[in-house]
């Protein structure tokens, strides 16, 4: 029976007799004495086999190879001073083996050496195909442990401190195609009918509030059949929460406590509270994006009023067409950002055009506030306009002003992208800094130009602000997103809980009453039986852990992730199925493989 885990042994365990199990991480024969690093999920410890002490264990050790599964019995000893290893927690001790039992060997050549630093250079496709080997690596093991710790911290806070109840909601439910495409599951017992895998437990958690559960949470599995997008998974995990009888501010305060508790428990970091708040309008005005990275400045400045009557048609024409002109003021940019980077073919030009802009206009502020720019701008701005630009942007000698002109969405999108690129170039982003904030007061709806209708910006169950309820198309929502260093960590809202308001929202997004009853009749009926005021939030667990682990991809914090093409290289899912299975489900495939 195991007495200890490998990574738990310390100097306080010296002279204890222990039984360990694990994998051979490294193996070395030093002139008759064999050393092996034994690894389990907690870490590594050095095993020593000396033929002068235990000939039997030495004979077994001589047959060891990397990744053999073994059992070791022995005594914990203090390492000699010259072999202390401060790089690992067990570096003060080693185990003198009394016996070594090989439980299993390795019968094929390893696709990569797990204990080698070169394993980091292995192609991701190989790592995913042999994921069970990849997960043996220290980095991946630590990521899974971190994920476990985050979930445990969430549970302890919600259950022990806030009286939440964990409730499971169905995985097989009905399709309500309002967001991404559903994953559909045919029903064998109800021919011609289909289940959908949930994109979120949204409706069920609201029904739990109608049921009187009061405070609900779930570590929920969710599914979205989205087009191929970098770093998205077709199945993902979220912390899902809903609570009754709580105000907007009370919900935000409770969630700040949750996130602060996770940081303190998992990283021993104290997060200051309350979190700053920005309205959606403020975020778009200052940063051009509704999830701003506030670890650095470089705020955008709207100069539409200054240039609306200028002779430079790019500026004046944009304003007259209902668009805007904004500036990204960049201090001390002279020796870092060249004109070549701004002009066609340059790095910043490419970033702006990829975001939809046609190009970038610029002005450099030289000594005595002289402007260095193209003649078309310099000759078509009055002295008064030039002075107003300098004053409004706070520009000083050495500043570079990057202009975006056009429709509001494109200008904001392109300048927001440039802001991040420039922030990195100037070294303004502190990777160790943690900035958490709320963005609130989102629009209820956005215009879908393709379908020529309004659609819910978040989802159609979000409550409008009371003062906007009589003008729903232009209403602001009682919604809130938590932003972590420019990435959305979670989002939620107060919910609609009156049937008449819910019906008005459905009507606003173009759902007829018949369609609304067909898709959401069970919810509308529930609202007739005493529904409490309620609200909730959901956090993307995969992304949260990725940020805490400082990983670049969420695939590195998920045990068995899918590729960008939504396939599993380990199991080769999705796969074809037997014709008999399709026949039982009354399904005929129309897909014709390419010959």
UniProtKB/Swiss-Prot annotation:
GO term, biological process aspect, one: aspartyl-tRNA aminoacylation
Residues holding L-aspartate: 178, 224, 458, 495
SUPFAM superfamilies listed in its UniProt record: Class II aaRS and biotin synthetases, GAD domain-like, Nucleic acid-binding proteins
Disulphide bonds in the chain: none
EC numbers, comma separated: 6.1.1.23
Entry protein name: Aspartate--tRNA(Asp/Asn) ligase
Physiological role: Aspartyl-tRNA synthetase with relaxed tRNA specificity since it is able to aspartylate not only its cognate tRNA(Asp) but also tRNA(Asn). Reaction proceeds in two steps: L-aspartate is first activated by ATP to form Asp-AMP and then transferred to the acceptor end of tRNA(Asp/Asn).
Annotated source species: Gloeothece citriformis (strain PCC 7424) (Cyanothece sp. (strain PCC 7424))
A family per Pfam: tRNA_anti-codon
Main location: cytoplasm
Residues annotated as site: Important for tRNA non-discrimination: 30
Transmembrane segments: none
Subunit structure: Homodimer.
A single Gene Ontology CC term: cytoplasm
Gene name per UniProt: aspS
One Gene Ontology term of the molecular function aspect: ATP binding
Reactions it catalyzes: tRNA(Asx) + L-aspartate + ATP = L-aspartyl-tRNA(Asx) + AMP + diphosphate
Family to which the UniProt record says this protein belongs: Belongs to the class-II aminoacyl-tRNA synthetase family. Type 1 subfamily.
């Amino acid at each position: 029976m195991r007495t200890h885990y490998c990574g738990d042994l310390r100097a306080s365990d010296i002279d204890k007799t222990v039984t360990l199990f694990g994998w051979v991480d490294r193996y070395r024969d030093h002139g008759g004495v064999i050393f092996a690093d034994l690894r389990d999920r907690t870490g590594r410890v050095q095993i020593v086999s000396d033929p002068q002490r235990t000939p039997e264990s030495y004979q077994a050790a001589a047959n060891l190879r990397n990744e053999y599964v073994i059992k070791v019995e022995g005594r914990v000893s203090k390492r000699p001073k010259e072999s202390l290893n401060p790089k690992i927690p067990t570096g003060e001790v080693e185990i003198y083996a009394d016996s070594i039992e090989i439980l299993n060997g390795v019968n094929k050549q390893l696709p990569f050496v797990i204990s080698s630093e070169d394993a980091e250079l292995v192609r991701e496709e190989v790592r995913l195909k042999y994921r069970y080997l990849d997960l043996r690596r220290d980095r991946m093991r630590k990521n899974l442990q971190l994920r476990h710790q985050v979930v445990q911290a969430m549970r302890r806070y919600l259950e022990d401190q806030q009286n939440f109840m964990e409730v499971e909601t169905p995985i097989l439910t009905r399709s309500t195609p309002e967001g991404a495409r559903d994953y559909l599951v045919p029903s064998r017992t109800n021919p011609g009918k289909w289940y959908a895998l949930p994109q979120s437990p949204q409706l069920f958690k609201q029904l739990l509030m109608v049921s009187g559960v009061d405070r609900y949470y779930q570590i929920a599995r969710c599914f979205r059949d989205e087009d191929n997008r970098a770093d998205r998974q077709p199945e993902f995990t979220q912390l899902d929460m809903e609570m009754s009888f709580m105000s907007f501010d009370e919900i935000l305060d409770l969630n700040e406590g949750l996130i602060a508790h996770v940081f303190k428990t998992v990283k021993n970091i104290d997060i200051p509270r309350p979190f700053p708040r920005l309205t959606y309008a403020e975020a778009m005005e200052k940063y051009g994006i509704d999830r701003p990275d506030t670890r650095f400045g470089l705020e955008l400045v709207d100069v539409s009023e200054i240039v609306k009557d200028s002779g430079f048609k790019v500026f004046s024409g944009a304003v007259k067409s209902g668009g805007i002109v904004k500036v990204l003021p960049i201090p001390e940019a002279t020796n870092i950002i060249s004109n070549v980077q701004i002009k066609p073919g340059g790095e910043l030009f490419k970033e702006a055009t990829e975001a939809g802009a046609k190009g970038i206009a610029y002005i450099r502020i030289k000594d005595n506030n002289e402007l260095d720019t193209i003649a078309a701008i310099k000759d078509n701005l009055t002295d008064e306009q030039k002075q107003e630009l300098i004053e409004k942007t706070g520009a000083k000698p050495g500043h570079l002003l990057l202009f975006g002109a056009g429709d509001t969405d494109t200008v904001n999108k392109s300048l927001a992208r440039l802001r991040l690129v420039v922030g990195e170039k100037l070294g303004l982003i502190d990777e160790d800094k943690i900035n958490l904030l709320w963005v609130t007061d989102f629009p209820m709806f956005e215009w879908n130009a393709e379908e020529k209708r309004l659609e819910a910006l978040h989802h159609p169950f979000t409550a409008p602000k009371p003062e906007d309820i009589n003008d729903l198309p232009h209403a602001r929502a009682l919604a809130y997103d938590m932003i972590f260093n420019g990435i959305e960590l979670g989002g939620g809202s107060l919910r609609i809980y009156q049937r008449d308001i819910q019906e008005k929202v459905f009507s606003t997004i173009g759902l007829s009453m018949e369609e609304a009853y067909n898709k959401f009749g069970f919810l509308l009926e529930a609202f007739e039986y005493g529904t409490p005021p309620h609200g909730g939030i959901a956090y993307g667990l995969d992304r949260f852990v990725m940020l805490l682990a400082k990983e670049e991809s969420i695939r590195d914090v998920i045990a068995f992730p899918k590729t960008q093409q939504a396939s599993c290289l380990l199991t080769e899912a999705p796969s074809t199925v037997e014709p008999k299975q399709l026949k039982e489900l009354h399904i005929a495939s129309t897909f014709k493989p390419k010959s």
